[in-house]
Structures are given as C-alpha cells and as structure tokens.
C-alpha cells in the first residue's frame, strides 16, 4: 500500500468520521467527547508534516474506516444519508478551495481559536461556538446549505446546532486534505476496491 494511498484514505476516513458524528448528534442530541475533540483538533493542524499529524488519535478514525468499508464495499445496505452529506461536503470543498478570499478568512479565524485554547478546552461550549461560527460565516455562504436530518427536538437546540456546524467544518478540513493528497470523486467509483482494501488494512494497524 503506497504512503499516498494510505494518507489519502486516512483523510477520507476523517471526512466520514465527522459525518458519522453529525448524524449521531442530530438523532440523539449528544456526542462522544473524545471523538468530538479528535475531529475538532484536525481543523487546527494546518501545516502538518504528514497526514498522521492531523489525526493524532488514530482510534477515533475507526468509525471513518468502517464507513468506508460499508459505503464503498460490497454491502447491499448503504447509508444514503451519509452519502448525501458526503456529496454536499465535497461540493462545498471545491467552492472553498477556489476562493482565495474564503481560504484567507478561514485561516485567520482558525488562528483566533488557537489563541482561545490557551484559556479553554477544545470541547468547551465557547470554543465549539467559534468553530460553528466559522462554518456559518464562511462555508455556508459558499453554496447550498446542507440539510441535516434528525430528531427535531434535538435539532432546535443551539448546542446541537453548534456541534453539528463545528463537525461539518472538521469534515471540510478533511475534504480539503483529501483533495490535496490527490483525492478525486472518480476514485470513489473506479477505485473503490483499492480504497476499501486500504481502509481494512488501516483498521488492523
């Protein structure tokens, strides 16, 4: 397995890991704090020496790798909701990377969160609110808004909305990295077996 394929699959798992948390929070109103922290941390690693630097908590990526296997593998039952979120994220990523203005604002806002972390934990409500604000102010303005399905009782809560937006920002960060590593949408059609095999090997490491 080539290093680039391994790293590209890792970044793709990062997208799906964040998407899985969005789905869970929308349905259940809560999240795994460690998984949430791992996804948010990936947003802050903007100049990594390797993809592994972005995803320091390898265990947190397990759900992402498992989703690669189930969504791109031979399983008959695909999660259409996960697919819809993924397609939306990849479409927004293209708009983001084509806008130097948006990328500049994104970098500036991420630096503000770095400074905030000298006073708060990454899963503190104020920090999550800032991650969510970045998504609302910059990413949401780029194109059609993602329609999140779930329990209306949870979705109307401000904290739930902020966690979802913060995680969508994390998914965007992984999508940008996936593209930088050579990821293309056609790979998800024509190279599915290779991606699935790589994900399965990654699950055993």
Curated annotation (Swiss-Prot):
InterPro entries: HflD (IPR007451), HflD-like_sf (IPR035932). It is found in: Cytoplasm; Cell inner membrane. Its main location: cytoplasm. Signal peptide: none annotated. It is a peripheral membrane protein. Pfam families: DUF489 (PF04356). GO terms for cellular component: cytoplasm; plasma membrane. It comes from the Bacteria. Keywords: Cell inner membrane, Cell membrane, Cytoplasm, Membrane. Belongs to the HflD family. NCBIfam families: PRK00218.1-2 (NF001246), PRK00218.1-4 (NF001248). HAMAP family: HflD_protein. This is High frequency lysogenization protein HflD homolog. It comes from Shewanella pealeana (strain ATCC 700345 / ANG-SQ1).
């Amino acid at each position: 397995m080539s290093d680039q394929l391994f790293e590209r699959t890792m970044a793709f798992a990062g997208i799906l890991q964040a998407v899985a948390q969005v789905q869970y929070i929308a349905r259940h109103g809560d999240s795994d704090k460690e998984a949430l922290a791992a996804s948010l941390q990936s947003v802050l690693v903007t100049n990594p020496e390797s993809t592994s630097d972005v995803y320091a908590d390898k265990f947190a990526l397990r759900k992402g790798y498992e989703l690669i296997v189930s969504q791109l593998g031979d399983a008959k039952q695909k999660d259409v909701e996960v697919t819809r979120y993924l397609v939306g994220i990849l479409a927004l990523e293209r708009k983001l990377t084509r806008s130097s203005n948006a990328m500049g604002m994104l970098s500036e806002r991420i630096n503000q969160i770095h400074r905030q972390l000298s006073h708060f934990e990454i899963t503190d409500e104020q920090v999550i609110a800032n991650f969510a604000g970045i998504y609302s102010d910059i990413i949401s303005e780029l194109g059609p808004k993602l329609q999140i399905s779930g329990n209306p009782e949870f979705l109307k809560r401000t904290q739930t909305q902020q966690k979802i937006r913060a995680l969508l920002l994390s998914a965007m960060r992984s999508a940008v990295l996936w593209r930088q590593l050579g990821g293309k949408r056609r790979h998800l059609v024509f190279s599915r077996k290779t991606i699935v095999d790589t994900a399965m090997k990654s699950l055993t490491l």
